Every structure is written in structure tokens, then in C-alpha cells.
């Protein structure tokens, strides 16, 4: 099995942040985002990485960013390492395929979730209240049902190791401003509807997904990642059957395994068997091939 990239360390480059998955380097006016093979579940980073996961996430993000350029600009300057600043070139072998050279935008203080199907925390909220983020939904929905129309459900941005919290659109307006929040909502729904239709043609249901936006030169742009298996629920269309959880092309396979363990869902993470690592990697790679027609 290929050795996963768990951490990066590039002498001469300034490490600005190390998130659950990405290492971000400050290049002055721009940023270098390196997507590692780290994987987290229940907000805990696992000890093992998933080989090629960083490559898969980067390539899927780049694919969707290109597809959505008619709706909104994105933060990418280039994903081709030969275009990167000269101080990055000594590390080209590690960076190739798993990194983006991006504009330095000011992130909005909310994460923007769109749901086309009812699942996960949305399903739990609906069972309790008949609504998600204050949006009333029809009675009688089953788990994994397609919603009558997609809904925009923002959340707070949590610190590493803590959980995001769903908020109402009105609360987002108070945090970010009404004008920008309205634009973000409209753009998010437009992106989702276009992506949902494109993915459907390739046998994938995008049940829900999460976006981040920023302001660059006074303009709203989309940043971070775009509709990857880490930020979305991807279901195989061929086996879709409402009324319960769905198989998926993401880390749900890992979550399901962890649910079988006597583990409190706090660090330290339990060790992962090689089979779980391998099968999780296969799920990610299958999503890349189905969406883009290309593997490694």
C-alpha cells in the first residue's frame, strides 16, 4: 500500500495553519494549500492516513471549481506545480496533484450547507422538530428522502476539535450582513442545482454539501474545497432507496466502522485495520473516477 502523506514540512515556507486535512502555507499575497491524506471522523483526526486521499480531494475540487465558473469565481490561481512560486519548487514531488496555489481571501464567518435530501444531522433535527435550521418541512418524510426543493442551512465555523452548530438564515444575516448572506444563499443553491444534475448523469446523488466563501478585492468568491467526499454526502444512484441510511462514496464507511467500537468519539483515535483504510480509499477513488473519468 502507498505510504500516505500525513504531514508536510517545507523549510523556507511559512506554515500558517494545520487543519484536519489541509496544511496551509502563507506565501505573502497568496496561499499554498496542501491536502494531506489525513482523515477525521467525529471531529477526531485518525492516526492512519488514506493513501491518495489528498490527490482525490484536490482533483475533485478543481473539477467542480471549473464547472461553476459561470456562477461564481473561485480562489484558485493554479493547481499546476510548475506555475507555483519558485520557493515551492523544491517540494514539487510532494505537492504534485494534491496542492493549490490560491488567492488570499477574507473568509466569511459561516459555513454554507445545502441539503437536497434529508440525512445526517438534518434528519435528526427533522425527527425532533419537523424542521431543519428553522425551515419547516412537509410531514411524513423518510430518512434519505429527496426534499421538495433544496434548502440552505448555514452553520457556525467551529474551532478544530469542536462541532459546527446549525444556525438560521436570520442568524447568518446578523453575523455576516443581510446583503452578503442573501447572495451566498442564492449562489449556494445555484451551484448545488447545477452540480446535482451533472452528478446525476454520472450515477452519483449529491445528498448535501458544504461550501465556504470569502471576499477578495471586494468580490464574493468560493474558497477552500468544492463538493468533495469530505464536504458532501455522495450516494450511488443505482442503489438509492429512501427509508434509511444510504451507502456512500465518502468516509461514512469509516464512521460506520467506528460506531461498532467501544470508543467515546474523543481523542486519541482508535487504530484502524488495514482493510478499513483500503476500503475507505477505494470509496474516495471511485468518486473521483465516476465524476471526472480519471483516476491517478
Swiss-Prot record:
<dbReference type="GO" id="GO:0005737">
    <property type="term" value="C:cytoplasm"/>
</dbReference>
<dbReference type="InterPro" id="IPR001636">
    <property type="entry name" value="SAICAR_synth"/>
</dbReference>
<keyword id="KW-0547">Nucleotide-binding</keyword>
<comment type="similarity">
    <text>Belongs to the SAICAR synthetase family.</text>
</comment>
<dbReference type="GO" id="GO:0005524">
    <property type="term" value="F:ATP binding"/>
</dbReference>
<comment type="pathway">
    <text>Purine metabolism; IMP biosynthesis via de novo pathway; 5-amino-1-(5-phospho-D-ribosyl)imidazole-4-carboxamide from 5-amino-1-(5-phospho-D-ribosyl)imidazole-4-carboxylate: step 1/2.</text>
</comment>
<keyword id="KW-0658">Purine biosynthesis</keyword>
<dbReference type="InterPro" id="IPR028923">
    <property type="entry name" value="SAICAR_synt/ADE2_N"/>
</dbReference>
<keyword id="KW-0067">ATP-binding</keyword>
<dbReference type="GO" id="GO:0004639">
    <property type="term" value="F:phosphoribosylaminoimidazolesuccinocarboxamide synthase activity"/>
</dbReference>
<keyword id="KW-0436">Ligase</keyword>
<dbReference type="GO" id="GO:0006189">
    <property type="term" value="P:'de novo' IMP biosynthetic process"/>
</dbReference>
<dbReference type="Pfam" id="PF01259">
    <property type="entry name" value="SAICAR_synt"/>
</dbReference>
<protein>
    <recommendedName>
        <fullName>Phosphoribosylaminoimidazole-succinocarboxamide synthase</fullName>
        <ecNumber>6.3.2.6</ecNumber>
    </recommendedName>
</protein>
